[in-house]
Amino acid sequence: MALIVDKHRPRSLDALTYHTELSERLRSLAQSGDFPHLLVYGPSGAGKKTRIVATLKELYGPGVEKIKIDARVFQTSSNRKLEFNIVASVYHLEITPSDVGNYDRVVVQDLLKEVAQTQQVDLSAKQRFKVVVINEADHLTRDAQAALRRTMEKYSPNLRLILLANSTANIIAPIRSRCLLVRVAAPTHKEICDVLASSAKKEGWPIVKGLHQRIAEESGRNLRRALLMYEAVYAQNEKVTDSTPIPPPDWEALIGQIAKEIMEEHTPARILQVRAKLYDLLTHCIPATIILKTLTFKLIPLIDDALKADVIYWSAFYEHRIRTGTKVIFHLEAFVAKFMRIFEMYLMSMDL
């Protein structure tokens, strides 16, 4: 059974319900005959991917939706083999090079070179170039981004790149200057409520406006999250009213539990217990930066105002370490230990 977030996903630019001006801009780009490289950025759950798939459909027609998943093997200079999944149609490829970590340069170089040197298979296609959609472009290493820049310069007649990112801050200037930047802003609370009402109508659920408003506020303007929360409410309750509780995601509840445990006891034994829970979150594919950010926001209301600036400083410090390092668990654990030390020192100063 498909989730409503997938089942009701708009398939064309006409079906998109908000940012209509942006949809019109994308349509005119697709029809112009001179489609540029795009860098599409904005917060999670704003609809970047949905808009790009709809734009590809405008570019090539319904054939874009006939996709398959290919497993490819790439070899590094040290003869290490990397297995990598590619989502592909006749007209486009979709890749997430950050899945292979620091070896993303190998994937970017080899795959894009191969695609760019291949002519369009479908001779009746509207466009003579192929499109490569790169997810999480802001997580690419500097080497991979440099390889990407060279590919953009060399193979632009046969290849167009669409980069998806949450922020442009981590993308090198030469790539930004070669792309048309498209910002997809997060939907407003009202726009989220309208989408929830539309989904309820399609599913035959009663429209509960108070619940829609609460979900829109709790989702942090993340439409994907709002739809998942909405479905969770209906999955767990037979009768839904304005006051029906909204269940938090399991990972968020676990981080809340970690925050309480950190506050209760400041010992090496407690750090070991917390480490096990952090490992659990990481093995369930929760990104380390999200864990750190959520944990910080859970801890902030529990501490005195005098400590808040210090805790936020160290959270930012270890977030930078996570982004530049490879063993994320070290930096998460270091933040927990640092917080315990700061809090313990504060308690000792209070006793004096």
Swiss-Prot record:
GO terms for molecular function: ATP hydrolysis activity; DNA binding; DNA clamp loader activity. Its main location: nucleus. Keywords: DNA replication, DNA-binding, Nucleus. It comes from the Eukaryota. GO terms for biological process: DNA repair; DNA strand elongation involved in mitotic DNA replication; DNA-templated DNA replication; leading strand elongation; sister chromatid cohesion; UV-damage excision repair. It is found in: Nucleus. Heteropentamer of subunits rfc1, rfc2, rfc3, rfc4 and rfc5 that forms a complex with PCNA in the presence of ATP. This is Replication factor C subunit 5. It comes from Neurospora crassa (strain ATCC 24698 / 74-OR23-1A / CBS 708.71 / DSM 1257 / FGSC 987).
